[in-house]
Every structure is written in structure tokens, then in C-alpha cells.
UniProtKB/Swiss-Prot annotation:
The lineage of its organism: Bacteria, Pseudomonadati, Pseudomonadota, Gammaproteobacteria, Alteromonadales. Binds a second Mg(2+) ion via substrate during catalysis. SUPFAM superfamilies: Enolase C-terminal domain-like, Enolase N-terminal domain-like. It catalyses: (2R)-2-phosphoglycerate = phosphoenolpyruvate + H2O. One of its GO terms (molecular function) is phosphopyruvate hydratase activity. One of its GO terms (cellular component) is cell surface. Keywords: Cytoplasm, Glycolysis, Lyase, Magnesium, Metal-binding, Secreted. This is Enolase. Its cofactor is Mg(2+). The keyword Secreted applies. NCBIfam families: eno. The active site is at residues 209, 341. Component of the RNA degradosome, a multiprotein complex involved in RNA processing and mRNA degradation.
Length: 430
């Protein structure tokens, strides 16, 4: 009864008004799983391919009818009759059928939507929550934890139309006793920050991920207004709340230099590493993502030596959720954490393999959304089901972001005493 009986792919809209792929997977039992593929703005060059139509007369070339056709015409016939309980086999059939290294034939957006929908259908068929099914697939049945949220409350870089170079300034409510209270702290800080920015006559418009996107004189000014907001909300920096950055450095890495146009400063690899180390020493920054360009492996190794014992250094564009690249990082002392994005690799099985490899090597794994999202909240279940300990899913506004937080609230309620919240100890180097 767990066998796949029907698969439907369709084109829907994401949070940026661009098309994306949705898949429905039906089982013989009548269970149906539905999932969508997210989409990134700042992307790593080695990510699995997101297939777009390129037809400029339709959605500015961003349609996904080719990916949808791949689901309906190629993937569906190949998967019919297979058990949704055998996630690894289902994913491998799609990967083999595509036959390319980066899923460029069908598109990672097509394969991923089906992969996640299969998992959701299987969970429904087993009459268990998705996070429980994921923990069983992961070989860690019954091992759960609620993630520390990294809440992106000031957006810059590719996620906003402002002059701030660093892409994300985040707060982590590490001092909260549970996820519910962590979320409350984040929401109160978000509203406090709006008041701080308004009082300074700064814009309170939001970027793609729901964080504010004001024009500020420097990256340090962004840190200062966040600290003011945290304190105004009644919390203590470094005890209740810590800071995290996503530099997305590949976006301002030009000809071997790091060009911070918003500040009028240019750095080489070594001096930009020093700049980040100085920020982490001056402010309670305990996590830095993509501090250096995805190709600057020497710079990454140097930064890891400098501050990797006390700051979590997260590889996003660097590793693109790819076990081959992650292994190189582990073997060469590059970074100490990986950002996990389903659509960078394109299937649930490969995502779980990357999380396991990271955790086995003593790296942390941070589960992440993309800047182009939908109401699909699967990453919440992934974070809990793999006991990853950290999640990045934007700010405290925009329903595409809040959907994930709300799902985590539901999961925490369902788990009761089993819903442990690790706080600061979940972050590498703490």
C-alpha cells in the first residue's frame, strides 16, 4: 500500500514572485505528500542546477515548465509502483535517470520536489510526523532536538537594495530555555529594532528574508543598531543573545580582492580574514557564514586557523551541501560547519548524507531556507529529525519565513519533554 500510484508536477509561485516547482505524490493507500522547491539569490557556482525555461516572453525567462514536464513525463513513469518507504532507492532512480553530475537534465528543482513529496507521503502512510520519519531515514530514530534559530533581522548584499555589503546580520537567542521562548525573544528584538531604525529616520522596509534593509554607513553600524535593539528589548548581549553573520563573500569577491563598496574598502584574503576576526573580537559574533569566497580555500584555511576554535565558520557557497566538497574541507581543516540547503544538492537522501558526514567529523550542520521560499515548512522537520541543533529561516515577518517557525512550535508541543533546546552549546566553538 506504500507504493507510488501517481505523481503530479506543477508550476507555482515563490515568495519573490518567481515560478517554482511543486510535486504531489500519491500512494496506493491514498496518502498524498506535497512539496515545493525553494530558490536562492546568492548561489554557489557548484550547486545542482535549477532548471529554468529561458523563455523571455514568460515570467522573464524564469518559468519552470521544463522541470514540471520532467516530473510528469520522465520521473513519474519511472517511480510508479516503487515503495515510498525506500527513499534511497526512489532518489537514486531519479538521479540515475537524470544521468548528469549536477542534475541539469531534469533540474534539481524537479528532483527535489518529488523527493520531499515522497518522504511526506511515506510519513502520512505510516501515520507518523515527518520529523519522525526523517529521523528513521537518517538512522537516528527517536533522537530529536529543537534548533537554535539564526534570525536574519538586517538584510544586505544580494538580499536587499541597500548599501550594506554583508548579506545577513542575525541574532541567536542562545539563552532561551526552549524554542518557544527563543522565538518570543527574536520577535521582541525584531520589533525593538524597527523602533530603533524609525527613531534614526532609517527605512523599515524589509528584504527577501523579512529582515530590515536600511542604508547604513557601515557593517559595524548594523551591528550597533542590533545591539541597541537587543538591549532595548530587555536582553543581555552574549548571555541571552549572540550575533551571527552571513558575509556571502563570493558576491563581492572581484579579481582576488574583497571589495566592500558600501564602505569604500578593498581587502585581500588575509586582511579580510583579519577584518572578520576583529569584528568577532569586538562584538559577540559566534558564527560567520561564507566569510571568504567559495574558491579561496587558502583564505578559508587561514581564517579557520585564526578563529575556528572560538567562532563557528559555516561553509555555504563553499560546500553547497555536497559530500565530495565537504570531505575536502574536513580533510584540509577548512571551516568547521556546513550550511544545509536541500536544493543545492537536489534530493533528501543526499542532504541526509551531507548532514551525517558533517556531524561524524565534528562539524555542525545548520539547516537553511533560501531567499526564494514558499509556505512549505519541510526544513523545520529536517532540523528536528536530524537533531541538527541550528536553523536559518529568516526574520519574524513574511509568512514564507514564519511558516517554518510555526511548524517548529507545533513540533515542540508534540514532543513535550523530548523537545530539548541546546542553546549556545549547539554552536561550534562554544
Amino acid at each position: 500500500m506504500s507504493n507510488i500510484s501517481k505523481i503530479i508536477g506543477r508550476e507555482i509561485m515563490d515568495s519573490r514572485g518567481n515560478p517554482t516547482v511543486e510535486a504531489d505524490v500519491y500512494l496506493e493507500s491514498g496518502a498524498m505528500g506535497r512539496a515545493t522547491a525553494p530558490s536562492g539569490a546568492s548561489t554557489g557556482s557548484r550547486e545542482a542546477l535549477e532548471l529554468r525555461d529561458g523563455d523571455k516572453s514568460r515570467y522573464l525567462g524564469k518559468g519552470v515548465l521544463k522541470a514540471v514536464a520532467a516530473i510528469n513525463e520522465d520521473i513519474a513513469p519511472a517511480l510508479l509502483g516503487n515503495s515510498a518507504f525506500d527513499q534511497k532507492k526512489v532518489d537514486q532512480i531519479m538521479i540515475d535517470l537524470d544521468g548528469t553530475e549536477n542534475k541539469e537534465k531534469f533540474g534539481a528543482n524537479a528532483i527535489l520536489a518529488v523527493s520531499l513529496a515522497v518522504a511526506k507521503a511515506a510519513a502520512l502512510d505510516k501515520q507518523i510526523p515527518l520529523y519522525q520519519h526523517i529521523s528513521e531515514l537518517n538512522g537516528t530514530a527517536g533522537k530529536y532536538s529543537m534548533p537554535v534559530p539564526m534570525m536574519n533581522i538586517i538584510n544586505g548584499g544580494e538580499h536587499a537594495d541597500n548599501n550594506v555589503d554583508i548579506q545577513e546580520f542575525m541574532v541567536q537567542p542562545v539563552g532561551a530555555p526552549n524554542f518557544r521562548e527563543a522565538l518570543r525573544m527574536g520577535a521582541e528584538i525584531f520589533h525593538s529594532l524597527k523602533k530603533v531604525l524609525s527613531a534614526k529616520g532609517l527605512s523599515t522596509a524589509v528584504g527577501d528574508e523579512g529582515g530590515f534593509a536600511p542604508n547604513l554607513a557601515s557593517n559595524e553600524e548594523a551591528l550597533k543598531v542590533i545591539i541597541q535593539a537587543v538591549e532595548n528589548a530587555g536582553y543581555e548581549m552574549n548571555k541571552d543573545v549572540t550575533l551571527a553573520l552571513d558575509c556571502a563573500s563570493s558576491e563581492f569577491y572581484v579579481d582576488g580582492k574583497y571589495d566592500l563598496k558600501g564602505e569604500g574598502k578593498v581587502f585581500d584574503s588575509e586582511t579580510f580574514g583579519d577584518y572578520l576576526a576583529d569584528l568577532a573580537a569586538k562584538y559577540p559574533i559566534i558564527s560567520i557564514e561564507d566569510g571568504l569566497d567559495e574558491s579561496d580555500w587558502d583564505g578559508w584555511a587561514s581564517l579557520t586557523k585564526k578563529i575556528g576554535d572560538k567562532v563557528q565558520l559555516v561553509g555555504d557557497d563553499l560546500f553547497v551541501t555536497n559530500t565530495k566538497i565537504l570531505k575536502r574541507g574536513i580533510d584540509n581543516g577548512v571551516a568547521n560547519s556546513i550550511l544545509i540547503k536541500f536544493n543545492q544538492i537536489g534530493s533528501l537522501t543526499e542532504t541526509l548524507e551531507a548532514i551525517r558526514m558533517a556531524q561524524d567529523a565534528g562539524f555542525t550542520a545548520v539547516i537553511s531556507h533560501r531567499s526564494g521560499e514558499t509556505e512549505d515548512a519541510t526544513i523545520a522537520d529536517l532540523a528536528v529529525g536530524t537533531a541538527a541543533g541550528q536553523i536559518k529561516t529568516g526574520s519574524l515577518c513574511r509568512s514564507d519565513r514564519v511558516a517554518k517557525y510555526n511548524q517548529l512550535l507545533r513540533i515542540e508541543e508534540a514532543l513535550g519533554d523530548a523537545a530539548t533546546y541546546g542553546g549556545r552549546k549547539e554552536i561550534k566553538g562554544q
